[in-house]
Design a protein with these regions (language model features):
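Flexible glycine/proline-rich, aromatic-decorated loop/lid segments
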Residues: 153, 157-161, 165-185
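Intervening/peripheral non-core polypeptide segments
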Residues: 20, 186-188
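Accessory "access/gating" subregions that flank catalytic or transport cores
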Residues: 5-126, 132-161
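Short, small-residue-biased leader/transition segments that mark boundaries at the very start
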Residues: 3-4, 188
Length: 188
C-alpha cells in the first residue's frame, strides 16, 4: 500500500496521499462495470478500426480481408499491400511479434500476467518475439525483485528499459512482413 509506494519511489517526504476532503461534493458519478468490458484489438490504419477479440475470432478471415482492402484503397498503390490473411493458420491468427510498453501498457499487473501466461513456454528462435518495456523504473525494480523479469527472459522475452516512446513507434518497430500486436497507449 502506501508504505510500499513511499519506499519504492525513495521520496517519503514528498509523498502525500491524494483523497477528497471530508466535505467534498461531486456533480455526479460515472460507474463502469469492468466485467462488461471485453478485450479489443485495433487493426490498421486507425484506432477506431477496433473489434472485440470474440468478434475477430468469430469472423477472422472476413475482418482481415476487409482490412487489407481498406488499406489498399487508402494507399492507392498496387506495388504496396498489407497481407494479414496469410497470418491465419488452422483458423487462428498467428502473431509474430508483441510489445508491452509505456505508462499505460507497461504496468506491473500487465507484465505479471504476461509472464504468468508465458511461464514454461518459449517464444524465441523465430517463433514469437516479445519486447517488454516496464512503465517506470520502480515497476522494473519490483518486477526484478519478484522474479517476473526472470520468468519473462526464460520465456524468450527481451526486457528493455522504461522510456517514453514505444506508444508512438519509437523502439521496436513492426518486423518486416510480421503481424505485431502491442499493449500500449495509442497516440493519434
Amino acid at each position: 500500500g502506501d508504505v510500499y509506494k513511499r519506499q519504492v519511489h525513495g521520496r517519503a517526504a514528498d509523498y502525500k496521499k491524494l483523497a477528497p476532503a471530508d466535505l467534498a461534493y461531486y456533480d455526479g458519478v460515472v460507474e463502469v462495470d469492468l466485467s462488461a468490458i471485453r478485450p479489443m484489438i485495433a487493426l490498421p490504419m486507425h484506432p477506431s478500426n477496433a473489434f472485440t477479440i470474440e468478434e475477430l475470432n468469430a469472423n477472422l478471415e472476413d475482418i482481415l480481408h476487409a482490412c487489407e482492402q481498406d488499406v489498399q484503397k487508402l494507399i492507392g498503390r498496387k506495388d504496396v499491400s498489407l497481407d494479414l490473411c496469410s497470418k491465419i493458420e488452422n483458423g487462428k491468427l498467428r502473431v509474430d511479434q508483441g510489445v508491452i510498453a509505456g505508462c499505460a501498457g507497461g504496468l506491473y499487473d500487465s507484465i505479471y500476467e504476461a509472464a504468468s501466461i508465458l511461464k514454461g513456454h518459449t517464444g524465441g528462435c523465430g517463433d514469437y518475439a516479445l519486447s517488454v518495456y516496464p512503465g517506470s523504473q520502480p515497476i522494473m525494480m519490483e518486477l526484478v525483485r519478484t522474479g517476473v523479469i526472470h520468468d519473462l527472459m526464460a520465456s524468450g522475452a527481451t526486457v528493455r528499459t522504461a522510456f517514453c516512446g514505444p506508444c508512438f513507434g519509437a523502439g521496436d518497430v513492426p518486423a518486416n512482413g510480421a503481424l505485431s500486436i502491442r499493449l500500449s497507449l495509442i497516440h493519434i
